[in-house]
């Protein structure tokens, strides 16, 4: 009888082909928690730190609600102790030969391999993610990251000559993927010689386990320190002496708030924000493969966020039908069950998804869900949102996990307009069997990473990042290394925060312009150079410029907000044409401008002399300006893309794309040379520019504009003169400027960092410190080229 029942059950299984449970034991994770008495503290300087009189939060299984342990909440004293440990270890670690650092990273990779079951079980248990994703993707990728960066450390002395480690790095993680996000960022930082303090969200034990494994390796215990606490401790971490950079990974609004809070505190803030991705499906795509790509992009536990799906109208109905059928076969369950597709990410993620669905329905959207879950269930079913009106607020809001928001499009041009119409620019995939069409769409998308007929591929050697509100920091590849390096000889930055700075009043009012006294001769008035010609300012006001003897040298226009608006509009109109120019065409224009400056040398030297510059220095400044234009013209020819081979078959193109409209506020020192040194790399990399020249001596820059009026396309370069603080305010608050370089006062630098949080534009400020523009390293070094363009990784996987 028993044999009959067994045979019947086996027959039923083969008939229905239903999944059965495949649970993964979590005994090893609980055993590790028991070694800490289920009470986790912080891991600092190679040992556990469990101070008294600290509040704690429970670490729970997000699916069952079982209390696994308690985690201490850090306070400012704990943050200070972690930073002090990192500072004490910095000199020893950063001065080690690259080969020694490589050996240490390789040993850590072997330790992770040895304890991989403990790592994947603990990560799945506390995050709720499917164990097969952590086991088959996260942990192997962590080992690959360490091995790749060990190789980079070994070759650092030759490959990264002229660069040095920043110092102590502060890292603030999000609760979604704390283990993998931490690995992406600590590997390059440690490889180049930095030490790290990681602030992990409460109840995130996996980073603490990793820190323990690293600390037990021996000779360098303080290079990696992990403390547990809320993101509100970020300003406390940034304010610690010696912290040279803060890298934040999390929600967009949290990053925006952190940008405002840390203005004036730290020299560098790297932001990796949001988790939404985009999938663009054309009418010539393999629909079956694309549907599986959608599942991987949105409803697998490798996806950090939701998906915005654009489908060409010709295949809309067929794709939606197949997608809904595929959704019905997805399995939700406990993350430690090896047969589930989706786990649960806690009440906060579930509530966020439910709010988005409710708002979308109230705005007229159709919602399809694969199954239903009770209101008290930890799971949120896979959800497909469609028919959302184009003007509804949800079309601009970030899509949370596990939602897919689908919209149709007709032509490739319309698809790019819709895709680029959101303020985010993280990652995207293009699905098309026509390679030419796929490449055209991939090049047109304003994102950091594009996959062709695939989604979510990762490789340590390939840079990953974003643009716009997704942040401008990178990890992986050479770009990830430069995130933690600075040019050799750069002094360590100290906080320059001005607590008396009134952000609401800075640069708000224009100073009164008074007559300069009796005119001894004709003083030529200079207008604003906007749209390829000189024009009068909107305020119909000019300011006198006096020479070193107090005599009137000329009048320049007093620009304002209206003039900045016109300059930005002109730059946007010129941008498509200039970006599409070949490197040879851009080089020819830069060389032509250099020749024009050389012809105008006597006049420029005379202008500089009247400003108080010695004749010899003035001649050298003009000659060096000509040299800079020719040098960047030559470097244009070397631009292009680099081919990176990844582990998956198929190349990855590393493209360097223009930032877009770049605003530059020039310093007062070296009025001509600094102007040219900042303008040349911006033009060489395909940007259109809005410049504010030296306030004390703007006339040499305006003399150059007379040559640009006949040589350059209209709107390519726009020069607005006036009060520096007022124009800086207008530029920093402008939402259609893609990047801003500021070289002025410390207060101006602080305001620029604060105001840039509006559209999260990347900024480069000097914090009130002068720069040696006549030196090659600071006036024409690789840092300017790196700042003048952004990276895009374009994946081209091969195979059926």
Swiss-Prot record:
The gene is: ALDH16A1
Query: Quaternary structure per UniProt?
Result: Interacts with SPG21.
List the coiled-coil residues. Answer: none
Q: What is this protein called?
A: Aldehyde dehydrogenase family 16 member A1
Record PANTHER family:
ALDEHYDE DEHYDROGENASE-RELATED
Q: Name one GO molecular function term.
A: aldehyde dehydrogenase (NAD+) activity
Organism, scientific name: Bos taurus
Q: What is the lineage of its organism?
A: Eukaryota, Metazoa, Chordata, Craniata, Vertebrata
Q: Name one Pfam family in it.
A: Aldedh
Q: Which family does it belong to?
A: Belongs to the aldehyde dehydrogenase family.
Question: What CDD domains does the record tag this protein with?
Answer: ALDH_F16
């Amino acid at each position: 009888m028993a044999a009959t029942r067994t045979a019947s059950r086996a027959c039923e299984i083969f008939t229905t082909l239903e999944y059965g449970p495949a649970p993964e034991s979590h005994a090893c994770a609980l055993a590790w928690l028991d070694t800490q008495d289920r009470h986790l503290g912080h891991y600092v300087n190679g040992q556990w730190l469990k101070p008294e009189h600290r509040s704690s939060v429970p670490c729970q299984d997000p699916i069952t609600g079982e209390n696994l342990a308690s985690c201490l909440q850090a306070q400012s004293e704990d943050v200070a102790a972690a930073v002090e440990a990192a500072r004490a270890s910095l000199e020893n670690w950063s001065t080690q030969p690259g080969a020694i650092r490589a050996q240490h990273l390789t040993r850590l990779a072997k330790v992770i391999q040895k304890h991989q079951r403990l790592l994947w079980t603990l990560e799945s248990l506390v995050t709720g993610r499917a164990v097969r994703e952590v086991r088959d993707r996260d942990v192997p990728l962590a080992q690959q990251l360490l091995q790749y960066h060990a190789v980079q450390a070994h070759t650092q002395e030759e490959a990264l000559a002229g660069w040095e480690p920043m110092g102590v790095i502060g890292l603030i993680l999000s609760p979604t993927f704390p283990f993998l996000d931490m690995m992406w960022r600590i590997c390059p930082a440690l490889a180049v010689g930095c030490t790290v303090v990681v602030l992990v969200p409460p109840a995130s034990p996996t980073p603490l386990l990793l820190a323990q494994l690293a600390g037990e390796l021996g000779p360098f215990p303080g290079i990696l320190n992990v403390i547990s606490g809320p993101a509100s401790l970020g300003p406390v971490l940034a304010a610690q002496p010696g912290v040279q950079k803060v890298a934040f990974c999390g929600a967009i609004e949290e990053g925006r708030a952190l940008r405002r809070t840390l203005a004036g505190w730290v020299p560098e803030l790297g932001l990796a924000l949001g988790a939404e991705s985009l999938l663009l499906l054309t009418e010539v795509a393999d629909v079956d493969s694309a549907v599986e790509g959608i599942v991987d992009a949105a409803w697998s536990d490798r996806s950090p966020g939701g998906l915005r799906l654009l489908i060409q109208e010709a295949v809309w109905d067929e794709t939606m039908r197949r997608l809904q059928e595929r959704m019905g076969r997805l399995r939700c369950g406990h993350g430690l069950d090896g047969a589930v597709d989706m786990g649960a990410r806690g009440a906060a993620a579930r509530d966020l998804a439910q709010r988005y669905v409710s708002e979308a329905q109230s705005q007229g959207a159709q919602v399809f869900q694969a199954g239903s879950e009770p209101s008290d269930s930890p799971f949120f079913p896979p959800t497909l949102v469609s028919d959302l009106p184009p003007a509804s607020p949800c079309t601009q809001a970030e899509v949370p996990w596990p939602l897919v928001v689908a919209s149709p499009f007709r032509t490739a041009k319309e698809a790019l307009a819709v895709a680029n119409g959101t303020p985010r620019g993280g990652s995207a995939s293009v699905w098309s069997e026509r390679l030419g069409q796929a490449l055209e769409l991939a090049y047109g998308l304003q994102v950091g990473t594009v996959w062709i007929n695939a989604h979510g591929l990762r490789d340590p050697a390939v840079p990953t990042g974003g643009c716009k509100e997704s942040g401008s920091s990178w990890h992986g590849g050479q770009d990830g290394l430069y995130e933690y390096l600075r040019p050799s000889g750069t002094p360590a930055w100290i906080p320059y925060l001005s607590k008396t700075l009134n952000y609401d009043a800075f640069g708000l009012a224009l100073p009164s312009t008074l007559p300069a006294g009796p005119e001894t001769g004709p003083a030529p008035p200079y207008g604003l150079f906007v749209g390829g010609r000189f024009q009068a300012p909107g305020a119909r006001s000019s300011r006198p410029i006096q020479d070193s003897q107090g005599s009137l040298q000329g009048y320049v226009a007093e620009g304002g907000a209206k003039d900045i608006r016109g300059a930005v509009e002109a730059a946007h109109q010129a941008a498509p044409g200039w970006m599409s120019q070949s490197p040879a065409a851009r080089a020819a224009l830069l060389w032509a401008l250099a020749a024009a400056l050389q012809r105008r040398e006597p006049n420029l030297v005379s202008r500089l002399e009247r400003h108080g510059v010695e004749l010899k220095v003035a001649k050298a400044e003009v000659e060096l300006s000509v040299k800079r234009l020719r040098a960047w013209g030559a470097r244009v020819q070397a631009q292009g893309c680099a081919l990176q081979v990844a582990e998956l078959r198929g190349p990855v193109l590393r493209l360097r794309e223009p930032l877009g409209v770049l605003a530059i506020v020039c310093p007062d020192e070296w009025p001509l040379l600094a102007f040219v040194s900042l303008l040349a790399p911006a033009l060489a990399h395909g940007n259109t520019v809005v410049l504010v020249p030296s306030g004390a001596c703007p006339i040499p820059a305006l003399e150059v504009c007379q040559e640009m009026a006949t040589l350059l396309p209209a709107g390519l370069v726009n020069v607005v003169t006036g009060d520096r603080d007022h124009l800086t305010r207008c530029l920093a608050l402008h939402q259609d400027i893609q990047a801003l370089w500021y070289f002025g006062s410390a207060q101006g630098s602080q305001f620029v960092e604060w105001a840039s949080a509006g559209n999260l534009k990347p900024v480069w400020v000097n914090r009130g410190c002068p720069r040696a523009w006549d030196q090659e390293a600071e006036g024409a070094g690789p840092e300017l080229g790196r700042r003048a363009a952004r990276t895009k990784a374009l994946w081209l996987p091969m195979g059926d």
